Amino acid sequence: MNILIYKWKVFNQADVKSAFEYFGHSVDMYEEKPLSSDSITGIKEHDYVLLADVFREYDVIFSLNYFPHVSDICEQTGRKYVAWTVDSPLISLYHQSVFNSCNNIFIFDKFFYYELKQLGVKNIYYLPLAVNTDRLSSQLDSQTREEKERFSADISFVGSMYHKNSYDDIKDKLPP
């Protein structure tokens, strides 16, 4: 299968690309250059004609998080759009384009999944987040014994809680 990853500033796109390639798919990454962008509102003007031309070369368009304009262009060009959320709640999922038949949307937040399912969104699925364990294992193998002892734990939280310094607000309430 010929897959295009719609690239943006997110941390785990390389892991997804590696997984697709591991299963024998041809994968390219494409980073859109908006025609214009408003720094105050964040609204971007997209070149729909250019994107449609790019998308026509692929069987599937994939993105981490959901982009309404990508869905609309996939609907128009007859391409499948697969989106896997990495943020929650993701406001873009409240756009009318979630009802496009081209979509296959995967959401890691089960409560948000249920909410959208109850709103009648079809082709929406629950899928937890994932990681390339081979990549992480190779990083761990390069650590010294002292680093491994210093950073070892029974449970680790990796990621962010969407609030600046929220750990500082809860650290005194955590068990030792």
Predicted regions and their residues:
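Nucleotide-sugar donor-binding catalytic core of glycosyltransferases
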Residues: 2-13, 119-176
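Extended catalytic core of nucleotide-activated donor transferases of GT-like folds
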Residues: 6-119, 134-143
